[in-house]
A protein has these predicted regions:
Chain A
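Short amphipathic alpha-helical coupling elements at transmembrane boundaries
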Residues: 7-11, 82-92, 246-253, 261-269, ...
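Hydrophobic alpha-helical transmembrane segments of multi-pass inner-membrane transport and secretion
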Residues: 14-40, 51-85, 109-118, 122, ...
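A cross-kingdom feature of multi-pass membrane systems that activates on extracytoplasmic/periplasmic
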Residues: 32, 36-49, 256, 295-316
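Short cytosolic juxtamembrane segments of multi-pass membrane proteins
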Residues: 3, 176-187, 433-445
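Small-residue-rich transmembrane alpha-helices
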Residues: 28-39, 76, 110-138, 152-174, ...
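Alpha-helical transmembrane segments, especially those used as permease/efflux helices
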Residues: 2, 6, 11-35, 52, ...
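Conserved transmembrane alpha-helices of multi-pass membrane proteins
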Residues: 47-63, 137-166, 185-198, 310-322, ...
Length: 445, 293
């Protein structure tokens, strides 16, 4: 089965692009940060420098692995689902489920290996740049030399490979279950997890108020609170979407003509599936907006108190921004990937719509309305989560209102989320519209 | 906007005596179209000329690859012929953009497909009124219910397609095709996925649309039983017209079809003489068929 996996990757490399990107990003981030371990282990590194480097390297370790895992799993799930026909064909020609599993895992390993190899170069540059920032801020001694060695390489390879294999197992299990006709489990655990995330998030945000304004870890509680709230909203996103649709569906459909009418009905029926798009969007907005604005508030507070930034503060800022950047990049990748998959999956539906008398423009209007509504829903709940953390932090840290830059930052984050959502769904739809309607309807889907 | 709407409404009532007219319609598929030395193209339609009067029910039959689906798609504006003229209700279908063709079809043409092509997220009533909504026309609830009652689905307005049987879905598709009061309804293998009883109901509904409501129906089928419901059958072989039958019986259609199949398999590229002045057996002169009226 491995030779089949190799052939299938070689014949159609394009469809593995998303998985490759996820692996590349994952391996790159892991190796970049772990090269700090290599550097710290070098000969003649003083204790403070070594400690700073080790702490920074460990920050990304835990959840970085999780992110890589989820990103690869998300792209592979889409990949396997789109090849339902091919997999059904393999089954009917006598492939056992175990053989299909081996094929998908084999493909995943091939693609992940390619991603890791490609990531080595950028990771060396990225690691050097990160190291440079620490050296410039004075946290690391000038006589320390950057090293990119066995720890970076082995951890990058191990984490990415592990994530790729695990994600492939997860994806193929989901797909074969769907093929066997079984419904996805209702997910009581999921509801419990979502509720727990909301409660813990609210608690974490509330805990901010019991802390001292000058405490160095003050930002941690509201930041984690915001992330947890965003996760909770993401879990309940189908229900939230239905709720908003209940309020706004009628006026929207009246306002937007046939396109909006179809969009409203499509979203009502597909609220559960749209969670795959809303989840990364809520996370992206919540995490990015909360961290960026809290950092702005912190900078302002420091400037107002007349203190210059200490090395620790600078370090914290660097790490904050790096972490947000990584989470945002992964969330964006997952958003674009799942949205692309969900839209290209609808070729047949768009064909039917055109045969019923819809012009290509009306199909685009339908998809555009759906994208707009999803963007508004996702960014609204992301903003809610982010705002909870930011307001709590601001009220404890300073007595002033939110600084003006926060609004600009927020708009920027919303714009990125909206652009990713709308460009992906409209661009994908445009591509499917090139197929004549009669042929689009005939496509198995 | 209003002008267009009015014109659409008029087209639904008054009408040209000739519902559909094809003049020398040709269509080739594949690379090298144009007749060069490396011509790999396949002629799907070869100068087909056809005229169907308003209020007729015509079946188009032929062996696989005879071009019957291409004929239907070219006539219905779903595909663009390489050359030739298509006129629906006396108006020429000009090969503009997809949007222009769609707007042309909206008021003149209705479709029924083998795979129903209903939208899964809409209810029966919403699917039926969708063409009106897309065209920006007023939706008359009573009229919708009346049309759905005619096809026997008056009690299924709120159901979704996945809650219906194949026969019921096809009846929704027929209601959707009729609700815009089109000049011509094109049906592409409408009974291809149905059991015999549902097929009979669907064919009776199409027949009723012609006899009672004066619509024009053009149906592509490979089933002689389905074809026997039509007023006349037009046969196609190798992209050319190959005869017709008036008031067809199942046996007569089957026999003619078997004969066509033999000829097509016999290796002859064109079973009927191409030279003008030599009408093929059963074919009106110069591949032109004019039916009754």
């Amino acid at each position: 089965m491995f030779s089949l996996a190799w052939k299938s990757v070689r014949q159609r490399p394009a469809r593995f692009l998303a998985t490759l990107l996820a692996a590349l990003l994952g391996a790159g981030v892991t190796m970049t940060f772990n090269s700090l371990h290599d550097t710290a282990a070098g000969a003649g590194v003083d204790d403070t420098s070594a400690e700073t480097l080790t702490t920074a390297a460990s920050v990304v370790g835990g959840y970085g692995t999780l992110l890589v895992f989820f990103a690869i799993a998300s792209t592979l799930t889409v990949n396997v689902r789109q090849r339902g026909e091919e997999i059904a064909l393999l089954r009917s020609t006598g492939a056992t489920p175990a053989q299909i599993k081996r094929m998908v895992v084999g493909e995943s390993v091939v693609v992940a290996t390619a991603g890791m190899l490609l990531a080595v170069g950028p990771a060396m540059l990225g690691g050097r740049a990160l190291f440079g920032m620490f050296q410039d801020s004075g946290q690391v001694g000038q006589d320390v030399d950057f090293a990119f060695g066995p720890i970076a390489l082995s951890s990058g390879f191990a984490i990415t490979l592990l994530a790729a294999v695990g994600a492939a197992f997860l994806a193929v299990r989901r797909a074969t279950r769907a093929l066997a006709g079984g419904r996805a489990p209702r997910g009581r655990l999921r509801v419990l997890g979502g509720a727990a995330a909301l409660v813990l998030g609210a608690g974490s945000v509330a805990a901010t108020f019991s802390m001292d304004a000058t405490e160095p870890a003050l930002m941690a509680a509201p930041a984690y609170g915001a992330i947890l709230l965003a996760v909770g909203f993401a879990v309940f996103s189908p229900h939230l979407l239905r709720l908003l649709l209940g309020w706004f569906a009628r006026p929207l459909a009246r306002l937007g003509g046939a396109g909006a009418y179809l969009a409203v009905h499509n979203m009502r029926q597909r609220a559960a599936q749209l969670a795959g798009v809303l989840m990364p969007l809520i996370l992206f907005t919540g995490v990015a907006a909360a961290t960026l604005s809290m950092q702005t508030v912190e900078n302002d507070a420091l400037a107002a108190s007349g203190l210059t930034k200490s090395v620790d503060d600078k370090n914290l800022e660097t790490l904050n921004l790096t972490v947000v950047g990584i989470i945002a990049a992964f969330a964006c990748l997952m958003l674009i990937n799942s949205l692309y998959a969900a839209t290209s999956y609808r070729t047949q539906e768009f064909g039917r719509q055109r045969l019923a008398g819809s012009t290509p423009r009306q199909v685009l209007a339908t998809v555009g309305f759906e994208g707009l509504f999803l963007t508004l829903t996702g960014t609204f709940f992301g903003t809610l989560a982010g705002l909870a953390g930011t307001l709590a932090f601001t009220s404890v840290r300073t007595d002033t209102a939110l600084p003006d830059q926060v609004y600009a930052l927020w708009l920027g984050v919303l714009a990125v989320g909206a652009a990713a959502t709308l460009l992906t769904c409209l661009g994908t739809t445009r591509r499917t519209l090139r197929t004549p309607a009669v042929a689009a309807v005939a496509v198995a889907g | 906007m209003f002008g267009k709407r009015n014109r659409g409404a008029r087209a639904g009532r008054a009408g040209h005596p000739e519902a559909l007219r094809l003049v020398k319609v040709s269509k080739r598929y594949g690379s090298g179209a144009g007749g060069g030395p490396q011509d790999n193209s396949v002629t799907a339609l070869d100068e087909v000329t056809l005229s169907l009067p308003a209020g007729s029910f015509t079946a188009i039959m032929g062996p696989s690859g005879s071009g019957k689906s291409t004929l239907l798609q070219c006539a219905a504006g779903l595909d663009r012929p390489d050359s030739g003229l298509v006129m629906v209700d006396g108006e020429e279908m000009t090969g503009g953009s997809e949007a222009e063709l769609t707007k042309f079809r909206r008021s003149r043409i209705g479709f029924v497909f083998q795979q129903y092509n209903l939208l899964p997220t809409l209810t029966v009533a919403q699917n039926t009124t969708l063409p009106l909504r897309l065209a920006g026309r007023r939706i008359d609830r009573a009229r919708t219910e009346q049309v759905l009652a005619q096809v026997g689905l008056g009690d299924r307005l709120g159901h979704r397609p996945d809650q219906l049987s194949g026969g019921q879905r096809q009846r929704v598709a027929i209601a959707r095709a009729l609700v815009t009061e089109p000049r011509v309804v094109f049906a592409d293998e409408p009974t291809g996925a149905l059991d015999m009883r549902s097929a009979r109901e669907v064919l009776r509904l199409l027949q009723q649309a012609v006899r009672v409501h004066g619509r024009t129906v053009v149906m592509v089928t490979h089933d002689p039983v389905a074809a026997s419901y039509a007023d006349s059958v037009v046969f196609l072989a190798d992209g050319r017209l190959a005869g017709q039958l008036q008031s067809p019986s199942v046996d007569a259609v089957a026999e003619r079809l078997a004969h066509l199949g033999d000829l097509a398999q016999g290796g002859a590229r064109s079973p009927y003489p191409a030279a003008p002045g030599h009408p093929a057996p059963g074919t009106a002169t110069d591949h032109t068929i004019r039916l009754g009226a």
